[in-house]
């Protein structure tokens, strides 16, 4: 009994520690930039006890930090869901092409219809992601397909989408600078408007994810077991993938194509909390938020006032890890 209690406490302790790390990093990150602000000055400002750097913190840095936390958590949760549903450790929104699909659709709105209202972006991004997801589901229905093959199929679809983005930048050069910044994945210039754009989506989707947590554990065990317990496996798979696509699409629409968070975060979380979705999903979301926050902070702090896009830094970390996973899966097979 005591051993069981200890095992249950370990994942909860890991989640608590991750939450504390995220809070501490957020305070530090707010202070880093062309003008350094000490952590104690940040805290006193946030508590309303000091107004020395109020404009910089409240209007420039705080919305950016909140957006990094929201987007990182959303992308990581989407990756954890996809890995559980597809039962593929290589699955993540960017690896299987979902992020590229949403990116292509969002860029079409940015370049072809520049006068479109900003709230159109998440819907267009979701539509693009959904098309890629449907194509992947058609590929995944082949029972003989290996995890590495599905990942490579996603990479191929992503390459096609990326080629489409490059073509649009050549064809519609008017807003190409904004498109390039968005394409690399960056939080530069983001403000409360983007927070207001992304937050409602996540406020709707995260409660849905919480409701679906027991179903995700069921799906990870296989379709036959799910059917035996009275669940419609195909319908459940559709709902879970729909939720993951909506999470990824809304995040990509606002912060651009930031890669590998959906791949890295669930793998790190699995080592800390195990496979149970009730621990894995919140841990993944927290780790995803931490990764994107660190990437954005480093991007601002390495060469101020010049900024390195967060998407470049996540790619530098994530690409070697993806190659390692690809090699590991090939050895298993």
Curated annotation (Swiss-Prot):
One of its GO terms (biological process) is siderophore-dependent iron import into cell. It comes from the Bacteria. It is a multi-pass membrane protein. Gene3D superfamilies: ABC transporter involved in vitamin B12 uptake, BtuC. Keywords: Cell membrane, Ion transport, Iron, Iron transport, Membrane, Transmembrane, Transmembrane helix, Transport. One of its GO terms (molecular function) is transmembrane transporter activity. GO terms for cellular component: plasma membrane. The chain crosses the membrane at residues 12-32, 65-85, 95-115, 120-140, 194-214, 238-258, 279-299, 306-326. Part of the ABC transporter complex YfmCDEF involved in citrate-dependent Fe(3+) import. Involved in the translocation of the substrate across the membrane. Belongs to the binding-protein-dependent transport system permease family. FecCD subfamily. This is Fe(3+)-citrate import system permease protein YfmE. It comes from Bacillus subtilis (strain 168). The gene is yfmE.
